From Swiss-Prot:
Residues 1-10 have a biased composition (Basic and acidic residues). Its EC number is 4.2.1.109. This is Methylthioribulose-1-phosphate dehydratase. Its cofactor is Zn(2+). Substrate binds at C100. Residues 1-20 are annotated as: Disordered. The active site is at E146. One of its GO terms (cellular component) is cytoplasm. One of its GO terms (biological process) is L-methionine salvage from methylthioadenosine. It comes from the Eukaryota. It is found in: Cytoplasm. Keywords: Amino-acid biosynthesis, Cytoplasm, Lyase, Metal-binding, Methionine biosynthesis, Zinc. It comes from Aspergillus fumigatus (strain ATCC MYA-4609 / CBS 101355 / FGSC A1100 / Af293). Gene3D superfamilies: Class II aldolase/adducin N-terminal domain.
């Protein structure tokens, strides 16, 4: 297997005329996220699961310039640790795998079809406001805002309503991305209905059953975070 990967690099896995193919979707999404200010300076990442394959954007590449041939492909399931045991079936030889990989795998192990990691300024700001106002162990909470309806209640439970309170757990940042994995897993266990985890002074991980749901949930959350920051400036409470 290793010799075959080295010989052909399984390029056929990222070659498709289908615009919905993960190798085509990931570059398109990364360009959008770059234009929205979510993934500046090569930060952030995106991964999509299709069947028993996981497609992941590379590390260290300007997100607006990613091309299908830059995409890594993993077999799924695959070990998270050690990195050397991960079952890559396509590795662009000149690029490094994403440091987000074990965190993406954590979402996929819980049934996600797509996981997005952004460095949104609004996400970072709300983690700082929550820490200052409520302490380091508090989660982000907001209610009575229409856009909350864009976030699921939990697997198979429908969507949140206007009068519901949205809660997003917050974990502390670490010096290295992969070291966030344990905290992410713990937050997912403590908040089993969540589809997102904020990382203080860093950004957010958002996942969904498929690409469209992950993207729209990420958009809804970013809207809510920006609104929360502006509400705080005006002295308006996030929860009524």
């Amino acid at each position: 297997m290793a010799q075959e990967i080295e010989k052909t690099n399984n390029d056929h896995l990222v070659q498709s005329s289908d615009p919905e193919h993960p190798a085509n979707l990931i570059p398109e999404l990364c360009r959008k996220f770059y234009n929205w200010g979510w993934v500046t300076g090569t930060g952030g990442g995106t991964s999509i699961r299709r069947g028993d394959h996981i497609f992941i954007a590379p590390s260290g590449v300007q997100k607006e310039l990613i091309q299908p041939h830059n995409i890594f492909v993993l077999e799924f399931p695959t070990p998270k640790y050690p990195p050397s045991d991960r079952k890559y079936i396509r590795k662009p030889l000149e690029l490094k795998p994403s440091a987000c990989t074990p965190l993406f795998l954590t979402a996929f192990e819980r049934g996600a079809g797509c996981c997005i990691h952004t460095h949104s300024q609004w996400a970072v700001l709300v983690t700082l406001l929550v820490e200052r106002e409520k302490g380091p162990d508090a989660c982000f909470e907001i209610s009575n805002i229409e856009q909350i309806k864009g976030i699921p209640r939990g697997k198979g439970k429908g969507m949140l309503g206007f009068f519901d309170t949205l809660r997003i757990p917050i974990i502390e940042n670490t010096a290295f991305e992969e070291d966030l994995t344990e905290s992410l897993e713990k937050a997912m266990d403590q908040y089993p209905d969540t589809y997102a985890v904020l990382v203080r002074r860093h950004g957010i991980y958002v996942w969904g059953d498929d690409v469209a749901k992950a993207k729209t949930q990420c958009e809804s959350l970013d809207y809510l975070f920006q609104l929360a920051v502006e509400m705080h400036k005006l002295g308006l409470p996030w929860v009524k």
